[in-house]
Amino acid sequence: AAFRYTDVKQTTFNTAANKYLLRDKPLQNKFKGIITTSYQTPLKTWQFDLTAQFNGSGRMPDGFVVPVGSNQYFTDEFGQNHHKWYPQLLGQVTKFFRTWSIYLGAENMTNFTQDNPIVGSTIEHNGHHLVDPSSPTYDASMIWAPIHGWKLYLGFRWSLERDE
């Protein structure tokens, strides 16, 4: 298990107040926690791994507009938008043989994805939503969470024997 707390600040100039302000840096989560468990059978033929991650909330940049209908954000007492914390779960099962092993795993088993990760990326034309990267509001830098759902993978490991 591990836990990280980060208090990253930056100085910004507020033209309305005509002064510098010390604020949380955008898109930096305040905390991250990881809990991992692993079990290997007594004959060492199977191994089971499970990892849970807890990713903390963070401030969004000035001017960020919360997507309509999204519940992934909140506004603090100073009017700043923040993304909420989110969990992730990862797992893997491995079957060992003498010189090789095969494994099956999954990532993002909570299936958490960020709502509308690319700001201003679509326009409506004749009832269809089209991608418009030339739009003046297009911004792909607001990524703070996974943009893909769960993934399943299968793999193979081969160990070369060494002469001792």
Predicted features and spans:
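Flexible, surface-exposed loop regions and adjacent strand-edge segments
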Residues: 14-23, 64-74, 118-128
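Residues that define the transmembrane beta-barrel architecture of outer-membrane proteins
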Residues: 27-33, 85-89, 98, 148-152
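Extracellular loop and loop/strand-boundary signature of outer-membrane beta-barrel proteins
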Residues: 16-25, 75-80, 90, 115, ...
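C-terminal beta-signal and adjacent terminal beta-strands/loops
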Residues: 54-65, 95-164
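Intrinsic-disorder/low-complexity loop/linker signature
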Residues: 17-18, 43-44, 63, 70-71, ...
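Extracytoplasmic gating/loop element in the C-terminal half of outer-membrane beta-barrel translocons
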Residues: 51, 62, 67, 72-83, ...
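Gram-negative outer-membrane beta-barrel transporters
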Residues: 1-63, 155-162
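Histidine (H) residue identity feature
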Residues: 20, 24, 29, 82-83, ...
